[in-house]
Amino acid sequence: MAGLWLGLVWQKLLLWGAASAVSLAGASLVLSLLQRVASYARKWQQMRPIPTVARAYPLVGHALLMKRDGREFFQQIIEYTEEYRHMPLLKLWVGPVPMVALYNAENVEVILTSSRQIDKSSMYKFLEPWLGLGLLTSTGNKWRSRRKMLTPTFHFTILEDFLDIMNEQANILVKKLEKHVNQEAFNCFFYITLCALDIICETAMGKNIGAQSNDDSEYVRAVYRMSQMIFQRIKMPWLWLDLWYLMFKEGWEHEKGLKILHTFTNNVIAERANEMNADEDCRGVGRGSAPSKNKRRAFLDLLLSVTDDEGNRLSHEDIREEVDTFMFEGHDTTAAAINWSLYLLGCNPEVQQKVDHELDDVFGKSDRPATVEDLKKLRYLECVIKETLRLFPSVPLFARSVSEDCEVAGYRVLKGTEAVIIPYALHRDPRYFPNPEEFQPERFFPENAQGRHPYAYVPFSAGPRNCIGQKFAVMEEKTILSCILRHFWIESNQKREELGLEGQLILRPSNGIWIKLKRRDADEP
C-alpha cells in the first residue's frame, strides 16, 4: 500500500514538474518575443529620421512593396536609387530587418574603410553549407587570420604561373567559337562561362575538368544549380529555416548538390596531399621529386603548405572551404565581365577599332600566347574592362552587417542594420562620371581619373574586405579578350532594354548576350 501511495505521489510530482517546465518554457518564449518586439520598436523609432521610399508597415516593413521576380526586383531597386539620387542614403525594412542602401561615394567610404564594419550580411549564411566559413563568409578574428595567410598566395609572381592555363583555355574557346563566324547572332554567355570554369578549376585545384568539352558533367551541373538555388532561397523567407527547407524538393536537391561538390573537392585535396607527401618521401630518400615535377602548381598546393603566425597548417576542411570559395567567386564574376565587355565592344565599333590597333601593336599578326609583358602593354584594353565594370559591375550589390552603431551622412545607423552598397548605382553618379550611361573607356586614362573620389568606383569592393583575387580576375579577362579579339570582329545589335538585367549573385542578362562574329583579317572595318 505504501509503495502504491509513493508511486502515485511520484507520478503527481512528475506531472507537476512537467507542467512547470512547460510553463517556464512558455514564459521564456513569451519574454524573448516581447524583448524582440521591444528591440524592433526601439530601432523603428530611432531610425525614423533616415529617408525612405514609402510607408513601412510593422513587422513586414516594405516586404509587400518588393517585386518577387528577379528582373523586376533589380529594376525596382535601381529606380529607387535614381529617384532618390539626391538623398545621401535610403532606408528599407525587409520584415523586421532594417536596410540602408548606399550609392554615394562619401557614404560608401564610411562603411568600407571601417576596420570594425567588416562582417558580411546575414544573407551570406546561405552560402555557408557550400563554402563553410572561408574567406568570403567568415568574420572577426577568423577572417583576419585567414586573410593574412592567403594574401601571399595572390602575389603577382605566383599569378604568372597561371597564364599558360588561361592561354590554353582561351584558345579552346576560340576554336569553339569558329563555327559561328559569318553566321547568325548567337548567345555567347555560356561559352565564356565554361571557359572561366575550366580556368578556375585548373588554377584552384590543379584539375582539368574539361567543361568546354563536356558541359554536362555532374560537377559542372552542380556548380550552376547550387548558385541558382542559393539565390532563390534568399528571395524566399519561408525557406530560410534549415529544417523547414529540407522538407521541400529544393532542400533535397540542395543536399544532393552539396554532396557532389564536397565529394569532388575532398577527393582532389586528398589526391594532391598524397602526391605532395609522396614527393617529400622521395626527396627524403634522395630520389628527387620526380613523381610530380611536371605537375602545374595550383592554389591548392599553396593552401596545403601555408601556415599561420604560430606555424599551424590549414586542416583539410579549411582548405576545402577556400577551394570552394575560389570556385564560387572565381568563374561567374569573371565570365560576366568578359561577356559584358564583348557586348559593349560590339555596340561601339569605334572603341573596338582602338582595341584592335593596340593588339596589332603588341602582337602584330601573330596568334602566339600572351605573355605577362604583353598584358602589361594592353593599357587601352584594361580601360575597356574598367569601363565595362563601371556600367555592368559583376557584383551589382553587396552588403555589410553593421556590427556597432555608426553615423552616415549625419544619420544614426544602428547595430544589426544591413548596409547595402549598390555599385550599379554608385558608378552612375554624374558628379564623377558625366554622361554616365555612355561607354567611354577614356574615363580611366590616368589624367582623366585624377581627383576622382576613390570610392566612386568599387567593382571589387574596397577597404579591408576588398576582393583578394582582383589581379587574377583582370589578368584572366585581358587574356581571354585579347585572344578572342585577335581572331574575331564583334557585332551586337541588342539594345540595353532588351538585355533583361537580373541582379542575382552576379549581374546577368536574363536574355543572354547575342553577338555576331566575323573573321578579323577578312572583314575588319
UniProtKB/Swiss-Prot annotation:
Broad class of enzyme this protein falls into: oxidoreductase
Subcellular location: Endoplasmic reticulum membrane
SUPFAM superfamilies: Cytochrome P450
Segments passing through the bilayer: 13-33
Record comment: activity regulation: Inhibited by N-hydroxy-N'-(4-n-butyl-2-methylphenyl formamidine)(HET0016) with an IC(50) of 38 nM.
Sequence similarity: Belongs to the cytochrome P450 family.
Protein name in the entry: Cytochrome P450 4V2
Source organism: Pongo abelii (Sumatran orangutan)
